Amino acid sequence: AVEYAIGDTTTKWVAERAKNGHPAPFPLKYIEIGNEDFGPVYWERYEKIYQALSTKYPDLIYIANSVIRVVGRENDDKRKDIPNFVNPKNVKVFDEHYYNSIEWACEQHYRFENYKRGVADLFIGELGISGKYPYNLLATGAIRMSIERNGDLNPLFAERPVMRHWDFLEHRIFLPMLINGVDSSVKTSFFYLAKMFRDHTFDVCLDAAIKDMEGMQNIFVTMGYDTGSKQYILKLINLQDKKVTLQPEVSGFKRPVKAHKTSLVLVPGKENT
């Protein structure tokens, strides 16, 4: 499959690719070795597969798997298993999967600040927060704030599930970004949350806090500066059932500034909207 996707023009599989109407190589960048695999057998096999692939395709980035469950304390760094790999230096990107509750997700708002640097890049390949809508969606955003605040981990994030058919929504814990039918599809609130994070990125993280936060542990905030657009971006998530008046504390502003607000308003009980 790799040779078919990016091999040179002299090989059999590239000839097949051209024959199928795609003479140019596909933009393959990453290969994940395994899926939710871990333990001594996997650590050994990862090294063998890594050596075979990286020798032939040195420009690709290889992703390793982590333990599925959270071991020990809820905020344990799953990457503590990296030293158990045959050659830890060959673990360039580490895939972490999380399935947990709304309460757990809110507790992880500062999770990645505590990660050891200089190890492997961070990849959240699967994230599923179960619980009552829309709090599960908002709690997902609280974790995403922690991911984007820690850009020095070179984080990657994969949205899932991307799409699900109307007929298979019943009893599903994790809702998709898109719901499709025979001739149409609908964007869900999960899609719009992802879009808001995508459309409002920053490359410089700044300190921000909410004044008088005592008793308001369901409010989450993060802030940064986008050097490309020269804009300051402040993000707020409110998991409460009511509107609240907040006074953000942001250092560095000497005078009032104009601001543009983008809101995602969610209605309890309307999961598929």
Describe the residue ranges of each PLM region.
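Conserved, mostly hydrophobic/aromatic
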Residues: 1, 31, 94, 157, ...
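Active-site neighborhood of glycoside hydrolase catalytic domains
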Residues: 4-13, 19-154
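Active-site proximal loops enriched in glycine and acidic residues that flank catalytic Cys/His/Asp
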Residues: 35, 66, 98, 126, ...
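Short helix/loop capping segments that flank catalytic or ligand/cofactor-binding pockets
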Residues: 41-42, 133, 167-168, 244-245
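Composition- and surface-driven signal marking solvent-exposed, interaction-prone regions
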Residues: 108, 135-137, 172, 179-180, ...
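Aromatic/acidic polysaccharide-binding cleft in carbohydrate-active enzymes
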Residues: 119-223, 227-230
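Carbohydrate-binding surface patches
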Residues: 217-257
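Acidic, Ser/Thr/Pro-rich beta/coil linker or hinge segments at domain junctions
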Residues: 253-273
